[in-house]
Amino acid sequence: MSSSSNPPVCSPEKEERSEMKIEIQCMENKQPLAASCSSASEGSGCFFLKSPEIATPATVSSFPRRTSGPMRRAKGGWTPEEDETLRRAVEKYKGKRWKKIAEFFPERTEVQCLHRWQKVLNPELVKGPWTQEEDDKIVELVKKYGPAKWSVIAKSLPGRIGKQCRERWHNHLNPGIRKDAWTVEEESALMNSHRMYGNKWAEIAKVLPGRTDNAIKNHWNSSLKKKLEFYLATGNLPPPASKFIVLKDIADGDRDSKQSSATKPFKDSDSLTQTSSGNTDSNEVGRDHFDSSSALLEEVAASRRIGVNEYACSPVEYKPQLPNLEPISEEVRINSKAYFERSIQRKVENGFGTPKHGNLYYKSPLDYYFPSEADLQHMYGYECGCSPGAASPVSLMTTPCNKDSGLTATRSPESFLREAARTFPNTPSIFRKRRKVVLAAKTDAVVVVNGVVKEVDRKEESKDMRKSLLLETTDNCSDDEELGLNGNAFNLSPPYRLRAKRTAVIKSRQLEFTSEKEKQPDNEIEFTSAKEKQPDNEIKTSEEDKPV
């Protein structure tokens, strides 16, 4: 076979015949039909064609070896300098005398040089994508010659070699190839085979009929390699649809819990396990955990709704932090509570009520109860002999809310009082026009009480002035008015209205509902009107004219 065994006197014709035998042997492509040869690198030949006597050591390679991937049949790769030298040698010998060509490469055989030229460096080699005509031609020739004789088949495809035709058939055109989705059984078999064979995809392909070594390699690197940790920990692969089933069951249970009532939650909770398949123990644990957590959340939400509705639909049992707050007498507190009980009874009859208390309901103390100003005017307007007009329906109650209404924002007692003051009907003109009043000088002031003009010194203590004015004003009320604990009349206005009341008394006009106004003589009324029409400088008394 080799010319090295011939004596030096051998003829050139005999040497050429021996080289032609090597070329014919390689061109007939007598490798096994298994696809294992398709995984070899382009610059390496098949293992039984390599000369072991002159094999290149692994340390001579100029490129670092791969730590993973298919096992190389040939050691070492071709450098760009070697490729250029091979081109010049093939051009010199016209691609025929491969023994002479191999002499340019001390560590390469003639077979390696031939394969490198035919599979990689030949400019006539077509490396582009396959056309439909080429695929049809391969299928037709395979029916004629069978899946063999790839060198003969390649002659009908210009620019293609037998190796390309073989790989195209086994990886794409073979009708026995499975192209559907991978099943769990196939992935488990691939896991077990990979533990035994590693990256030998041709050996793994024997375990998976219908899957090519190329498809097995792509599926392992792209998808299955990420599931390796779970497989090594449990021994099983996670089912693809189990996660969707569990999430669907939880969503269905959440929807059922929203539709169920507070007294009978989760009446359809048994349907959670009817749609789940596989891993029943884990589903049971997840269902129990979901039921308990959802029930707790629903109870907390119901208690919150009850707490807010109680605050909005019931009398405000809150102790406001107001300055100078005087204690309310026992009789006032009892009467005001009776009034609110009647109001609540009317609202319950109209269809509004308070829902039942939940477990998280907080009941504030009932001893500290403060009615609003509008309620006190409604309760004591007739007792003082005054005519308040229409009774104010406004109280410390918010707008009656229905049980089915949503959650409303909480409001402070100050906002209730402010709204009651704005919506109170028949507001006295004193409160509406108090900003137009021109006060007297800082030293003195003219006060008209019951038609009598009085000069009041501003320097005297405010406590004595407030007490005297309060006593004179309460004379207008009926004799059966009830006094407070200290003998003084009970002030119906809140503490922050005390200044407005004092300003109203200083004014030169009387309340419209004063019952004693009709009893005044005509001359006193005229005198009062004249005082009102005078300018401010005439009404005020200068400090110089003041009698000593």
Curated annotation (Swiss-Prot):
Nuclear localization signal, short sequence motif: residues: 86-93
UniProt feature, compositional bias: Basic and acidic residues: 529-548
Keyword Ribosomal protein: no
Keyword Chloroplast: no
Keywords: DNA-binding, Nucleus, Repeat, Repressor, Transcription, Transcription regulation
GO aspect biological process, one term: response to ethylene
Name assigned to this protein: Transcription factor MYB3R-5
